[in-house]
Amino acid sequence: MGRFIFLSSGLLVVFLSLSGTGADQGCLPDWTLYEGYCYKVFKEKKTWADAEKFCKEQANGGHLVSLQSSEEVDFMVHQTFPILRYDFVWIGLSDFSRDCQWKWSDYSKLFYKAWNNEPNCFVCKTTDNQWLRRDCNRQQYFVCKSRVPR
């Protein structure tokens, strides 16, 4: 009986420590689940290419975040603002090949847009739904996104 209570208590502690992190839904620890994807804000600055490479190394299928709706942008702003305050984060949209073909790094289709014309990679403000083009070699904070593993 004592072993059963100890084991049950241990499982409860593990469950409570994982709840709310997305881990109970298949996300890595410290990643947040939203609409079938896992997200993580990184509070370190990298160039666009280095941030994209880093995201690929963090999670299977990971990339810089692609934003497909205003609701997803609102979710991301809700995640980034408490951590980064008034700043910008790299998103996965770029014209890295400089051929005027804007593409998401995860190869998803570009349906939703919120920008003005400037350089070749994009940041999103941490306070609202505004995208700005930036020089890809500039160092910025970033958000990674990956599908929930099946």
UniProtKB/Swiss-Prot annotation:
Expressed by the venom gland. One of its GO terms (cellular component) is extracellular region. Belongs to the snaclec family. Gene3D superfamilies: Mannose-Binding Protein A, subunit A. It is found in: Secreted. Negative results: does not block the glycoprotein VI (GP6) and does not inhibit platelet activation induced by ADP-, and thrombin. Keywords: Disulfide bond, Hemostasis impairing toxin, Platelet aggregation inhibiting toxin, Secreted, Signal, Toxin. It comes from Bitis rhinoceros (West African gaboon viper). Heterodimer; disulfide-linked. This is Snaclec rhinocetin subunit beta. PANTHER family: MANNOSE, PHOSPHOLIPASE, LECTIN RECEPTOR RELATED. Residues 1-23 form the signal peptide. GO terms for molecular function: toxin activity. Disulfide bonds join C27-C38, C55-C144, C121-C136. Its main location: secreted. It comes from the Eukaryota. Antagonist of the alpha-2 subunit of the integrin alpha-2/beta-1 (ITGA2/ITGB1) on human platelets and endothelial cells. This protein inhibits collagen-stimulated activation of human platelets in a dose-dependent manner. In addition, it antagonizes the binding of monoclonal antibodies against the alpha-2 subunit of integrin alpha-2/beta-1 to platelets and it coimmunoprecipitates with this integrin. Residues 34-145 form the C-type lectin domain. SUPFAM superfamilies: C-type lectin-like.
